[in-house]
């Protein structure tokens, strides 16, 4: 596995300790990490090609691969809202292409129950996926929050070869993260992880309570073997 960080959470201190993409790149280099992930709406000074190319070259100089560029997703809403979300995802693919990021992140939210909403959601993922196939960019579906069944359903129904799973250890339905460390007994997040680990192309490892020096709400002694047994060899 490769170890990296996600340049999204810019700190609760005011002003933030890390305020820009550049500061995150430097921090990742200081930690001697393998890669860095970006979020399209956080920390970038510009979306102009010259700036993006400079950012890519800085990462190369620091020995950092770029894992993915986080976009939006959550394909629910009016026709106008869905069109805007799809176009934003395509625009983020163009940015990812310049940066050298092989993938964009797309959220799925709470499992949809209405059949028509599900169909519209899938059509959006398919349209973005088709654009990605033209420009050479993959999509990573991030559970946020989801069940294992819903992740599998979306990926299978979208049916695009450039659609993988961005495995989020904390954002499952019923996760202890939503209730100050207390899991929902109606959901088994480790079963969801077992269901979906074989689909993972990238992992977001969440940490919520580490006062003791170990994560207390999420059990990584259970998660790492799940990933290893699935043959996972990607980024963490």
Predicted regions and their residues:
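N-terminal pre-domain/capping segments
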Residues: 1-101, 133
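A short acidic, helix-capping loop that chelates divalent metal ions and anchors anionic groups
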Residues: 11-14, 74-80, 110-115, 173-177, ...
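Alpha-helix N-cap and loop-to-helix initiation/capping positions
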Residues: 16-23, 46-54, 80-88, 113-124, ...
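Acidic/histidine-rich catalytic cores of soluble enzymes
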Residues: 18, 35-36, 69, 126-225
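Alpha-helical scaffolding segments of alpha/beta enzyme cores, especially the outer helices
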Residues: 23-27, 50-61, 84-98, 120-130, ...
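Residues at the N-termini of beta-strands
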Residues: 35, 103, 202, 234-235
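A short helix->loop->beta-strand "cap" motif at the edges of active sites that frequently abuts
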Residues: 64, 101-102, 137, 230-234
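Active-site groove signature of glycoside hydrolases
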Residues: 96-116, 144
